[in-house]
UniProtKB/Swiss-Prot annotation:
Mg(2+) binds at T26. Its EC number is 3.6.5.3. Monomer. InterPro entries: EF-Tu_GTP-bd (IPR041709), EF-Tu_GTPase (IPR050055), EFTu-like_2 (IPR004161), EFTU_2 (IPR033720), G_TR_CS (IPR031157), P-loop_NTPase (IPR027417), Small_GTP-bd (IPR005225), T_Tr_GTP-bd_dom (IPR000795). It catalyses: GTP + H2O = GDP + phosphate + H(+). PANTHER family: ELONGATION FACTOR TU, MITOCHONDRIAL, ELONGATION FACTOR TU-RELATED. GO terms for cellular component: cytosol. Residues 136-139 are annotated as: G4. GTP binds at residues 19-26, 81-85, 136-139. This is Elongation factor Tu. Residues 10-206 form the tr-type G domain. It comes from Janthinobacterium sp. (strain Marseille) (Minibacterium massiliensis).
Amino acid sequence: MAKGKFERTKPHVNVGTIGHVDHGKTTLTAAIATVLSKKFGGEAKGYDQIDNAPEEKARGITINTSHVEYETESRHYAHVDCPGHADYVKNMITGAAQMDGAILVCSAADGPMPQTREHILLSRQVGVPYIIVFLNKADMVDDAELLELVEMEVRELLSKYEFPGDDLPIVKGSAKLALEGDTGPLGEQAILALANALDTYIPTPERAVDGAFLLPVEDVFSISGRGTVVTGRIERGIIKVGEEIEIVGIRDTQKTTCTGVEMFRKLLDQGQAGDNVGVLLRGTKREDVERGQVLAKPGSIKPHKHFTGEIYVLSKDEGGRHTPFFNNYRPQFYFRTTDVTGSIELPKDKEMVMPGDNVSITVMLINPIAMEEGLRFAIREGGRTVGAGVVAKIIE
């Protein structure tokens, strides 16, 4: 049978499976791909294809991740699944696979376990906006009351980490039954119910081009007779000639006006997300702008230097530190295009952080950076990456 051609018209959403080891994340991933390919077309993937996750590098860190695609009536999904707990930690902190929503897989037979809790906390810290729960292995629990108890436990745990535990969808089923072709309520029907929850509960993400204009400054030139040109790749939004913009970060915020946009030496009336452009600024001196700042829509982003974050510290094998670090450790924080020195405050109960650990920290930078919750950064020592992190909450 001929495969239908891939329709780019469907909105695209990124999701992933999270949860405790052996609760069935990979089996569920295979079941979703298999059941949906039967119903809506697309490629079915077996458990072995998914479990054998290829290595990839994100910010110099090796992560094993499997990528699976599937579609529903209304959407196209890209789904990530990681084999090991450490891969999840790295994946979520580096943002290698940004998730618009996550499917928390929890065994109905075991209930929430340590990694269930840790993945929920990580989701909160790195800004995963929506979680849907799949109570797996429901065929192994005969007692309806027990099933209800596990559901209550999971809801309470989610609420504890500020997710709407009472309101988010929970689907009960068996990924194994579904994968084996069982068409009953715990088999394929549960997978279709989960797909419906994905479609209805996770909103379509805003496209980059619809966001507020933001361009991280990579280089600054002065062109005689024309003024100052700032180059970089537009991260989100659109910039039109004649619009006011702000230069944010490192020093006091300045206002200026875009008098031209160039791409491949051609003049344009606008640039949009994804474009590598030169932006001509009116009345701005070359020394007023530097790498590490951003050009942004006025009022859309502010400079900050005090924040909490979640970091993963590279292990020795990954080229990281060989020794632990302690409170008040002062590395460089690499945001977008530049390094800023900052000091790290550890949680009260943490005396030191070992290579290979992940930990919540509070950071004080020496210079402010245009910052939002969810912004990724690298931690460096003398140009060498020793960790990766994400801004969890801005303090000031």
